[in-house]
Swiss-Prot record:
This is Trk system potassium uptake protein TrkA homolog. Residues 1-122 form the RCK N-terminal domain. Residues 141-223 form the RCK C-terminal domain. GO terms for molecular function: potassium ion transmembrane transporter activity. It comes from the Archaea. NAD(+) binds at G7, A8, G9, R10, I11, E30, D51, T73, G74, R98. Part of a potassium transport system.
Length: 228
């Protein structure tokens, strides 16, 4: 398959790398010049610096011959517009829309007319909600195995002795094939993290990681502070 991805953020990058590892052809459209240059070092496919809500940019990504288009930025409005434009240019393309607002997601699932433009609607909260459910119904549960993807979703307990406690996500230096999908503080409050999110001194961190990255992720997340 040939897949065009909008957004070279944490999610877009991880999806692109996973698709390429399965033998698919990938193109990424990214507005930020530095980010576009950086991501070109990690994927073998086409990287286009530009706005995916611009018809010419989508055409440069060969959208008319693509099998799927995934709008994965953190901006709902831009994702929506890009999916509509992709469908207009290629009526047979499968569109995947990322929505950060869970309330909007249900609208896209329930309104029949919207399904013309959006084949699949996903949100980071879906993954977190599924994890919460599994935790509640399965005593002692702290990981989800994803054999088809060659990956796991795993929970790490955080306390004041952990090296990562109090640090922003962007400073953890996690491997490329991993992604923090949820952070809980000691009161159980959920945060879908960005790079600036601070790891709590007490709580849990939920991470998606490919098997090749698991050991490095565990090493980072389980490291304790050196005694003074």
């Amino acid at each position: 398959m040939y897949i065009v991805i909008m957004g070279a953020g944490r999610i877009g990058t991880l999806v692109a790398r996973m698709l390429e590892s399965e033998g698919h052809d990938v193109a990424i459209i990214e507005m930020n010049r530095e980010r576009a240059r950086e991501i070109s070092e990690y994927i073998s496919g086409l990287v286009i610096e530009g706005d995916a809500t611009d018809q010419k940019v989508l055409e440069n990504a060969n959208i008319k011959n693509a099998n799927a288009f995934a709008a994965l930025t953190g901006k709902d409005d831009a994702n929506i517009l890009a999916c509509i434009l992709a469908k207009h240019l290629n009526p047979n393309i499968m569109t995947i829309l990322r929505i950060t607002d869970p309330g909007k997601k249900k609208i896209f699932e329930d309104v029949k007319e919207l399904k013309t433009y959006f084949d699949i609607v996903v949100s980071p909260e879906d993954i977190a909600a599924n994890y919460i459910f599994r935790t509640l119904v399965t005593p002692g549960f702290n990981r989800v195995l994803l054999p088809r993807e060659g990956a796991e979703i795993i929970q790490f307990q955080i306390d004041e002795d952990c090296e990562v406690a109090g640090k922003p996500v962007k400073e953890l230096n996690l491997p490329k094939d991993s992604l923090i999908i949820a952070v809980y503080d000691e009161k159980g409050n959920l945060t879908i993290p960005s790079g600036d999110t601070i790891i709590p001194k007490k709580g849990q961190v939920i991470i998606f990681a490919k098997n090749s990255a698991l050991q490095e992720v565990k090493k980072i997340m389980e490291k304790k502070k050196k005694e003074q």
